[in-house]
């Protein structure tokens, strides 16, 4: 949501993709910074609902397709209801 900061975005990525310790990212990562910019712009343009997992996943794919592919390759993407 619009109250999530950089650390919250990094946490979501690490958790959603179940990244192993060696691949975890932090709030200073360029992907996290770019996502925050996009999210902030969405809310600045009037969005008032939270972004869902699918939207965030697609955002990562749009920003960095190679990294997205790497994350998904772990094969442990958190599924709904899990």
Feature names for model-found ranges:
Residues 1-82:
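Terminal or standalone catalytic/regulatory effector modules within metabolic enzymes
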């Amino acid at each position: 949501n619009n109250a999530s900061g950089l650390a919250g975005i990094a946490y979501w990525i690490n958790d959603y993709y179940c990244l192993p310790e060696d691949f975890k990212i932090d709030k200073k990562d360029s992907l996290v910074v770019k996502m925050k910019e996009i999210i902030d712009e969405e809310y600045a343009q009037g969005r008032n609902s939270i972004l869902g997992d699918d939207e965030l996943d697609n955002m990562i794919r749009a920003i960095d397709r190679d990294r997205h592919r790497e994350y998904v390759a772990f094969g442990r993407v958190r599924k709904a209801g899990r």
